[in-house]
């Protein structure tokens, strides 16, 4: 029995296009399906195109957008994280990227580190999402040890012989850890 990827309309996403690589289809599919998946539950979620990064989980009813604060500078990496929480309430919080401990942070804080280190591609988001799934976090606000979960996911990649993903995850993780060390945060 074979397993196929089926989109929300019951169509194999690879069957919808011709003359493109699977990578191009996968990235286009990601942008069309994940980044625009608003309003699929009774609770409304919102993604904003003016944000540095915006993501949502209709299943949890949460949506988050990340912006640089007005006082942002390289020496003062302050971000505004705002959106809608699982209770349907709007929230806004100020996050200093220098004070984020990836061994005990929320997914939102991990994404601020992603933005601060220039990791804003769909692949970077999916790396972080894989860690969140490994952490079994029920909310973007739930804290977890994302370093531990990165090591676990990398261990899985190693066992499976998925060296491209292993090396990409390692490079991404090292970039985050280098930033954390340079910012002076120690734990």
Predicted regions and their residues:
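Type III/flagellar secretion export determinants
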Residues: 1-187
């Amino acid at each position: 029995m074979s397993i196929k990827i089926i989109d929300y309309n019951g169509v194999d996403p690879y069957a919808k296009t011709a003359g493109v690589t699977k990578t191009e289809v996968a990235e286009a599919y990601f942008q069309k399906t994940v980044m625009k998946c608003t309003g699929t539950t009774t609770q409304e979620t919102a993604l904003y195109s003016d944000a540095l990064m915006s993501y949502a989980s209709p299943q949890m009813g949460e949506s988050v957008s990340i912006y640089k604060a007005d006082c942002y500078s390289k020496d003062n990496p302050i971000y505004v994280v705002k959106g809608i929480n699982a209770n349907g309430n709007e929230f806004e919080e100020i996050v200093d990227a220098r004070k984020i401990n990836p061994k005990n942070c929320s997914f939102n804080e991990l994404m601020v580190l992603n933005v601060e280190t220039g990791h804003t591609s769909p692949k970077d988001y999916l790396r972080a999402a894989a860690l969140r799934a490994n952490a079994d976090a029920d909310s973007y606000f739930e804290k977890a040890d994302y370093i531990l979960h990165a090591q676990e996911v990398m261990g899985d990649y190693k066992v499976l012989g998925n060296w491209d993903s292993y090396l990409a995850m390692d490079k991404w993780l090292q970039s985050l850890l280098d930033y954390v060390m340079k910012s002076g945060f120690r734990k």
